[in-house]
Amino acid sequence: AGAIFEMGEELVWASQPAPMMLFHGDADANVPYNVIRESGVGFFGSKYIAGQLRAMNSPYYFYSVENASHVIATAPMDGNRDAIDAFLSKLVVDKEPLMIETDETTIGAPEVRKNFTLAEYIASNFL
């Protein structure tokens, strides 16, 4: 799970980005899953970044986990090594022009809160 902080309300790429692999839970209270804009700045999460990469026809792999918190930030190193290897082999080494999206949902899992304010993101990281 990660995000890009941008001084401005839109994420602007100076050039075509390198292939990216993104893992993110849609209930992350530490890092925005999509985007939050406030006072002329933006905090752009994995879902938003993946959408921009798709619009630019730039290779990426986005693994989204429904109802998952920031725990997804470390989980891929244990549970997704095959996907990481495939990403590195196909998109980085072989330069295959692929856009891959995987949505993981646990059947019967309860819905959790998914919308957070900028103040809540700051508090969860620094207070």
List PLM regions with ranges:
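Short, proline-enriched alpha-helix->beta-strand connector loops that line the catalytic pocket
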Residues: 14-20, 56-59
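Primarily recognizes the serine-hydrolase "nucleophile elbow" in alpha/beta-hydrolase
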Residues: 1-16
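Short, glycine/charged-enriched secondary-structure capping and boundary segments
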Residues: 13-17, 35-38, 77-78
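Surface-exposed, flexible loop/turn segments at secondary-structure boundaries
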Residues: 6, 28, 70
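C-terminal catalytic histidine-bearing segment of alpha/beta-hydrolase fold enzymes
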Residues: 54-127
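Short beta-strand/loop motif that positions the catalytic acidic residue
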Residues: 21-24, 28
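Conserved alpha/beta-hydrolase "acid-adjacent" motif
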Residues: 29-45, 72-75
